[in-house]
């Protein structure tokens, strides 16, 4: 069996180190930096010939820089005769550009990125909670899309929730919310119907379901500006919700996210470590982070040993 080696770019160094610790190994020796003009510079400083290589790199902000780091690292490892290269992308950027609505003159950038990664020599992709699962079909190589829900669920069960109800912040998240509700002792579910007048601006319309006197658990795949969740929480509290907890896998926290969350009525925001948090977000008392390092380490181990990934999520 080829030697398994982990490498990491500059996007998620803490998560990469946690994964390495879980696997009782160390990160590979690679210098990933910049030339004086800003171009990505990569130097692999150890033998990887024939190795089973995993590159841990989210394509979060700065998205283009982190994507280019990943691509250039793949090329460097491929030219160094790596046996198999798996791109471990905890957060897959550009995933929201996955279709042309009403044949609008826009790109399907998720497909462009998938082609880019395939063309430079990625043999396999491991990612977490793709914004749209069908993005897996954009790739010409195997994609393992694992879920953060078991980690989130474990935390929910420790919250001492009183008469909980799982809430989807929009119609598109119903499937995710239903799955969480089923695992959370088959609890009830509510849906927030909203309309989005323009990008990153959400207007809550009304709530489908009875939330009065209950602990509400909002679940989503990501938090961007936080506008959706904060307005959803306001609507829930107006309808008599007792407490509101917001759970999401990917903490993008762009734009006015810090102010939105600081001034919101959300009791606690719980996210995963697929994207590093800024100092401003870390300073917020109602934001807490869970690590996916154990789950990703197990997925990497299974891929390296040719074991089933889907078996991790069988209940």
UniProtKB/Swiss-Prot annotation:
Enzyme class: transferase
BP-aspect Gene Ontology terms: 5-phosphoribose 1-diphosphate biosynthetic process; purine nucleotide biosynthetic process; ribonucleoside monophosphate biosynthetic process
InterPro entries: PRib_PP_synth_CS, Pribosyltran_N, PRibTrfase_dom, PRTase-like, Rib-P_diPkinase, Rib-P_diPkinase_bac
Sequence positions that bind ATP: 37-39, 96-97
The keyword Cytoplasm belongs to this UniProt entry's keyword annotation: yes
Cell compartment(s), UniProt: Cytoplasm
A Gene Ontology term for the protein's cellular component: cytoplasm
Enzyme Commission number(s) from the entry: 2.7.6.1
UniProt cofactor(s): Mg(2+)
Cofactor info, note text: Binds 2 Mg(2+) ions per subunit.
UniProt xrefs under SMART domains: Pribosyltran_N
Reaction(s) this enzyme catalyzes, per UniProt: D-ribose 5-phosphate + ATP = 5-phospho-alpha-D-ribose 1-diphosphate + AMP + H(+)
Residues that bind D-ribose 5-phosphate: 196, 220, 224-228
Keyword list, A-Z: ATP-binding, Cytoplasm, Kinase, Magnesium, Metal-binding, Nucleotide biosynthesis, Nucleotide-binding, Transferase
Molecular functions per Gene Ontology: ATP binding; kinase activity; magnesium ion binding; ribose phosphate diphosphokinase activity
Pathway: Metabolic intermediate biosynthesis; 5-phospho-alpha-D-ribose 1-diphosphate biosynthesis; 5-phospho-alpha-D-ribose 1-diphosphate from D-ribose 5-phosphate (route I): step 1/1
Active site location: 194
Annotated binding of Mg(2+) 2, by residue: 170
HAMAP family: RibP_PPkinase_B
Quaternary data: Homohexamer.
NCBIfam families hit by this protein: PRK01259.1 (NF002320), ribP_PPkin (TIGR01251)
PANTHER family: RIBOSE-PHOSPHATE DIPHOSPHOKINASE FAMILY MEMBER (PTHR10210), RIBOSE-PHOSPHATE PYROPHOSPHOKINASE 1, CHLOROPLASTIC (PTHR10210:SF41)
Biological role stated in the UniProt entry: Involved in the biosynthesis of the central metabolite phospho-alpha-D-ribosyl-1-pyrophosphate (PRPP) via the transfer of pyrophosphoryl group from ATP to 1-hydroxyl of ribose-5-phosphate (Rib-5-P).
Family named by the database record: Belongs to the ribose-phosphate pyrophosphokinase family. Class I subfamily.
Protein name: Ribose-phosphate pyrophosphokinase
Encoding gene, per UniProt annotation: prs
